[in-house]
Amino acid sequence: VVEAAAEQDYEEFGKKNVSSMDADAVKSALLEAGLFAFIKQRPYDIIADPTVTPKGIFVSAFDTNPLAPDFEFALKGEEANFQTGLDALAKMAKTYLSISVKQKAAALTQAKNVTITAFDGPNPAGNVGVQINHLDPVSKGETVWTIDPQAVIFIGRLFNTGRVNFTRTVAVTGSEVLKPAYCKLQVGALLTNVFAGNVTTDKDLRYISGNVLSGKQVSPNGFLGAFHSQLTVIPEGDDVHEMFGWIMPRFNQFSANHSYFSWLMGKKEYTLDARIKGGERHMIMSGEYDKVFPMDIMPEYLIKAIIAGDIDRMEALGIYEVAPEDFALCEFVCSSKMEL
């Protein structure tokens, strides 16, 4: 058994003035402290290669996924660290900060050393991939980096305090959470105490580190993902038996393509479970992906090229600037029940 110490010891990296540092010095500091692992690159949506100079670094300061945390709330008290983090990123490449038109925090709307763009619209407007596609698309031979806004705060803490502090503000959400709330958690934190006594107990549950569309399934005794600022709990749905399946007319269940009459009832809240409600079948070229994919890319043709392993066609159709999360809504509405 490994027990936590009563007091936490920190390795001291020393406070640093970012304004007097060059790109190599910033990069070395992040690598030494282990913070470079929070920077991803496109193409491939993998940990960024520090030997490659990106044409831009993109930060999305808002999340439009279901029940997503409000970054303005997480930003309170961390404004100075956030700006320092942006300053550090700007030393390495031109940095783009994407915000929502609804956000009013001065630390976002008046951030320095970055190009600020305000976005409006429903999910997936908050996806950094959508923002890259509209601001500076990635072509063959080009690289961009992405980083989530709370990781920008991690970087700011490093330079302002000389210490690594992986504390995140995490939203505990989902229809099966008794008291949805924000909490402070370390990256990789054990989730047992977060869920204990705070979820329903009369059904099987799906625990997710992240959101329901692109998060990762965990156990109730699992751990917080390194890139996640949200925890979600929904019904598993494996105990539900419905007469005649999808053929039965219903007024209380959601359907993306109006298969049920519930769309006649106007906007309302639904309790969705983890069921796929059907088996995987042949891909149907229906145009349904295009309705939820606001990028200058043809998603159905790109997916077909990926399935066929046609690299030339993948390159021509935009494989370099997308990530799995960009296809999350496509997977949700997919009539073929394909795992994209």
Q: What do these predicted regions represent?
A:
Residues V2-L340:
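Buried, small/hydrophobic-residue-enriched core segments of structured protein domains
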